[in-house]
Amino acid sequence: MPNIHDVEVRDLQVNADQRGHLVEVFRSDWDEYEIDPEMSYYSMTYPGVVRAWHRHLEGQIDHFVCPKGRITVGIYDDREDSPTQGELDTFVIGEHNQQVIRIPGDCWHGFKAIGDEPSLLINYPTNLYDYEDPDEERIPYDDDRIPYDWNAEIHG
């Protein structure tokens, strides 16, 4: 259950049979996608690699899904006008815990691939990526402004 204002989590239904499984990861009638995504991309990440921290200041909302492998997602709220300013949320998602996480883009966020295999993250952002002027502010994964240790023991 998320603590941060505007973060939402939806359990995804895994429809499995003897052939494998099928999982819906985007439906326009889901509340988490109240603003339709403008694009989609995937990121393959090797075990132990951290991709953090960044945020978007132009209103983008991200929607993370991890269909293969496992990742820890970290979200930190330092928005001055937020009722949850200073809160940190973490989630472990992946092939054995299929969820979509709605992330307000103006919160710092990132993820770490955990386990022994590469992880696949799919994102459905609400803004197109602008190669000439990216809407991204970045700080190192171990920046002291965010009270999170990516190497801490995983409980989930």
Curated annotation (Swiss-Prot):
The keyword Chloroplast does not apply. GO terms for biological process: polysaccharide biosynthetic process; protein glycosylation; S-layer organization. Its EC number is 5.1.3.-. Substrate binds at residues 19, 24, 39-41, 51, 54, 109. InterPro entries: RmlC-like, RmlC-like_jellyroll, RmlC_Cupin_sf. Disruption phenotype: Impaired formation of the tetrasaccharide present at 'Asn-532' of S-layer glycoprotein Csg. No effect on 'Asn-47' and 'Asn-117' glycosylation of S-layer glycoprotein Csg. Belongs to the dTDP-4-dehydrorhamnose 3,5-epimerase family. This is Probable low-salt glycan biosynthesis epimerase Agl13. The gene is agl13.
